[in-house]
Amino acid sequence: MLLQRIGIEHLRIWILLLLISLVPAALIRDRRRTSDDFSLFSYDYDDKADAHDADAAFRKFEALCSARSQQPSTSKPSLIDALCTSALKKE
């Protein structure tokens, strides 16, 4: 009865609009959850960042670069690979 009153076509349009609005949000949320390249630094927006945090971040970066250099390169190089390569050239 309710479907006849609303009309099946209007219901289909509302479902389609709902799906169109939910799918991009789910994809963006999933992309943020699986992004490993940006989990290197703990973001602290305090102005009093001390040298200990910078040293710890640099050690994490070195460990990441050495781990990535030991893996076989089966995919296209990423931004983190380019950063590691340029950091190794400067040493």
Swiss-Prot record:
UniProt keyword annotation of Signal present: yes
Domain of life: Eukaryota
UniProtKB keywords: Signal
Signal peptide: 1-25
Protein's recorded name: Uncharacterized protein K02A2.5
